Amino acid sequence: MKPSSILRSLALAAALGLAACTTVGPNYTVPNNAAARRPAAQAGFVEAQGKAISLDPLPTQWWRLYRSAELDALVEQAIAANTSLRAADAHLRSAAAWVARVDAEHDPHVGAVVAVKRARESGEAFLLPERLPVVNEGELAVQASYQLDLWGQLKRGEEAAEANLQAVEAAQDVARVSVVAQTVQAYVQICHAQAQKLVAAHALDLQERSLALAERMLEVGRGSSSEVLRSQGLVQAQRASLPRFDAERDAAFYRLAYLLGRLPQDLPASAVACATPLQLVQAVPVGDGTALLKRRPDVRQAERQLAAASARIGVATAELYPDIRLGASLGLVGIAEHLGRPATQSFGFGSLLSWHIPDAGAKARVKMAEADAQAALAQFDGVVLQAMSETETALSRYRHDLERQASLHEARDQAAALADQQKRFVEAGRHPYASSLDAQRTLANAEATLASNDEQLALDQVRLFLALGGGWETGEP
C-alpha cells in the first residue's frame, strides 16, 4: 500500500473516531434520594438547646476556645508528628501518583526498540525454498501509539482516580480530626486527674483530723474504740482513692506521648503540670446540619467514594464498544552489519480496531460496577445518618450532664453553707467539734462528686467537637 493510501486510511479512521466520540456511563451528581438531600439533614439540631449551646459556626480550630497556650502547642505537635497522620500523608501521595499515572493514559505512548540476535530465519517464512544462512540480525526502531477515547473510558477513569484521590484526602482529614480530639481529651484527663487528686487529698486531711479527734476523745474517756476504728477505716478508704488519680494521669500522659509521636521519656514535664481544669468561656458553637455535612470529612470521603464508583460504571460500559488505536513505527531492520542502508529502512502507519465479541463478560462487569455504586450510595447514606446520630447524642449527653452539674453545684453550695454554719456553732461552743468535721466531710464528698462531673462535662465537650467534625482545616481560627 502506498504511503498516501495509508495516510488517507488513518485520516478516515481518526475522523470516524472523533465523529463518534461520546462519554458513556452516568454523569455523576449526588442522588436526589440520598440521605444528605433530606430537609431534616440540613436543618438545625434537635438537641441544640439551652444557653450553653450556640448556633454560630464552629471555628476551624475549636481547641483554641479553651484559651490554653499549652494545649495549643500540644495539638500543633500532634498534627506535625503523629504517626497515623504521617501514614495518611503517604497514602495521599500514593493516590496522587495514581492520578498522574491514569492521566498519562491520554498521552501518546512512545517507545524504542534496540535488538541484536544471531539467528537463521525460516526460508518458508519468506516464500523461499532454500535454507537461509545464520546471520547477525539487528533492529532499531521508534514506535508510537495513541488510543482514541471514543467512549470516554479514559475520561471516566480519570474521574474515578480524581474522586479516589479526594476520598483519600478526606480520610487524611478524618485521621486529623481524631488525633486532635484525642490530644485534647488526653490533656483534659491529665488536668482533671490532678484537680480531683487535690480534692481527694483535702478530704483525706479532713478524715485524718477526724481520726485524731476520735483518738483524743477516747484518751480522755469521752469517746469509744468503735468510733476510732470507724475513723481509721474512713482514712484508709480515702487514702486508697489517691493512687487512682495518679494512674489516670499517667495513662493520659502516656497516651499523649503516643499521639505526639514521642517516647514517654521525651515528653516534657510541663505536659503533666496542669492542675486547673480547662474551661470554655463561651457557649459551644454547633452550627446546623448543612454545615455539619459539609464539614465532616467522613461524609466527604463517602461521597467521593460514591463519585468514584459512578465513574467506574462508565469505564466498564466503554468495554462494550470497539477500541481504536492509532500506531506508527520508524526504524531499521536487517542484517546487523547492513543497518543504515536503504534496504533496511522500514516504517509503518495504521489503526487497530479491537472488539470483544461475545461481550457477556463486559456486561457482567457493568452490572458489578452498578452494584458497587449502589453499595457506595448505601455507605454514603449510612455515614450521613451516623454523623447526625453522633452529633445529636453528643448534644444530648452534654445537655443532661450540664443539668446534673447545676444540681451538684447546688448540693456543693448547700454543703458549704452547712460546713460554715457548723464551724460558727463550734466556735460559739454550741456544737461539738465532731459535728463540724462531719459537715466538712460532707462538703469534701460534694466537691469530689462535682469534680468528677466536671471531668465528664469536659469530655462531653470534646466528644461533641469530635462529632461536629472540626479540626481538619488548616486555616486561621
Feature-to-residue mapping (PLM):
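Periplasmic alpha-helical coiled-coil/stalk elements that build and connect Gram-negative outer-membrane
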Residues: L154, A163, A170-D288, R397, ...
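Terminal intrinsically disordered/low-complexity segments used for targeting and assembly
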Residues: K2-A11, A15-A80, G138, E162, ...
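Sec/SRP-type N-terminal targeting helices
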Residues: R86-A87, D103-A104, L148-R176, S226, ...
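Small/polar, glycine/serine/threonine/aspartate-rich low-complexity segments that form flexible
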Residues: K51-I53, P57-Y66, V114-Q143, D266-P285, ...
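Transmembrane beta-barrel architecture of outer-membrane proteins
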Residues: L71-A73, E137-E139, Q185, R230, ...
